[in-house]
């Protein structure tokens, strides 16, 4: 397993939690472009704040935040992997406030996924994250707690549930 993290603080916590994994500190997009052919399976989750319904509906419309342009890295990674990756891959992001520019392969929980393999639909017990109020209620809370992200609960709400991630990985390895 190889994780690419831009933040040295988050990478350090990740490495402590998962000592068997390789942790690379750097630009995930540049790493993907340079190393995609080395992996049997790729999971990428480009930054989502500029796409999310929450920022658009609550922030821009509800609170008057300035709109920001969507980060097109999401679609660049999808197109790149569609045309160059030989192994299995999945790109994950939150449901956007607009119609996706590339049709997702599947949708589960609060996420859209683009992939080159099928994943069977499934419901998960932990799907209702609205009832998680403390940071420690979330899987992965140690990593986000180490970050400089101001709204840690919101960041964790956007993470993929561990059971869902395992379901997708199992489908990729089938």
Identify the role of each PLM range:
Residues 1-174:
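Conserved active-site and SAM-binding loop architecture
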């Amino acid at each position: 397993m190889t994780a690419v993290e831009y933040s040295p603080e988050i990478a350090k916590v990740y490495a402590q939690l998962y000592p068997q994994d390789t942790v690379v500190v750097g630009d995930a997009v540049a790493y993907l472009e340079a190393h995609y052919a080395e992996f049997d399976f790729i999971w990428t989750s480009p930054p989502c704040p500029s796409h999310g319904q929450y920022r658009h509906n609550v922030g821009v419309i509800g609170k008057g935040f300035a709109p920001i342009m969507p980060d097109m890295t999401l679609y660049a990674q999808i197109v790149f992997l569609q045309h160059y990756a030989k192994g299995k891959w999945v790109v994950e992001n939150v449901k956007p406030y607009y119609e996706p520019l590339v049709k997702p392969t599947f949708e589960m929980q609060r996420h859209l996924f683009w992939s080159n393999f099928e994943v069977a639909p499934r419901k998960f017990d932990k799907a209702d994250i609205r009832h998680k109020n403390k940071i420690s209620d979330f899987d992965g809370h140690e990593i986000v707690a180490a970050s400089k992200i101001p709204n840690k609960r919101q960041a964790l709400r956007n993470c993929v549930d561990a059971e869902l991630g395992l379901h997708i990985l199992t489908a990729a390895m089938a």
